[in-house]
């Protein structure tokens, strides 16, 4: 589980970026982004993350949820995000929390 305050338990297995299917982030804007996509991208911007391609960020966000659905720990997902994107540990946590909040809120607690 993630929390908006990053107070979640971060114990688990290590994932590689290839396991998650993550690639370098990018932010260019997508022509047909859904309102969920737009909210996710806006939250990334608000959190100071500006990847060069919106499409890549959205794809990576879905990969975060896929990994969580497969039972990978939050810690492992965050490590994979950091490795794949070059974000700092804090940036990777923020990206993962924003992704989960937007696309798989069942993994986010309100604490």
Swiss-Prot record:
It comes from the Bacteria. It holds the Pfam family DUF732. To M.tuberculosis Rv1271c. This is Uncharacterized protein Mb1323c.
